[in-house]
Amino acid sequence: MTKYIKLTLNLSAFLIVALLGFTLVSLVTHNKLDRLTASNANIVGTMSEYKAAVKDKERRMQCMTQNIYWEAASEPAEGKLAVAQVVMNRAESGKFPADPCQVVYQKNIIYERVLCQFSWYCEQNFNTKPVHKKLWDESAEAARMVMVDGFRLPELKDALYYHADYVNPQWNKKQVAKIGRHIFYK
């Protein structure tokens, strides 16, 4: 009988240990699954945020490239970079919208007249496809250098305005540089 009791006790102990082990494994597994599920939720949230950020970056690159193309396509590389830098200077100045696209597309109404910050936008060129791929690619490269790489021309660090040299806007601003056919002011 004592052998039977010992066997029963050993079997009971084994079952208890096995049950505890199974419970612990189950708890650990569920805990890992819960963390994995939470982690996946974060990844999904992070992925959607990432996709939104990529889409926003592409939007900003597109409008900056358009602005450079329509404002300075025939300018030398330095002139294209200068136009992009003025947009970024404005966006970073606190005097204009903080988003480069909003800077590009900004309109003002003065004496009941709509004035665009950049003339090509008022001329409705935003719906016109660029015809010179090489100039478009150069404009895109200038946009990338200024917006992504942070390239800046030192002489334009404070420039917020510019105009073509064949226009006389009667501004009372300090000229800081002339690059290509554009004159830059702070």
List PLM regions with ranges:
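N-terminal Sec-pathway targeting helices
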Residues: 1-17
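Intrinsic disorder/low-complexity segments
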Residues: 14, 19, 39-42
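Hydrophobic alpha-helical membrane-insertion segments, chiefly the h-region
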Residues: 17-28
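Bacterial extracytoplasmic/cell-wall-associated proteins, especially those involved in peptidoglycan
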Residues: 26, 30, 34-186
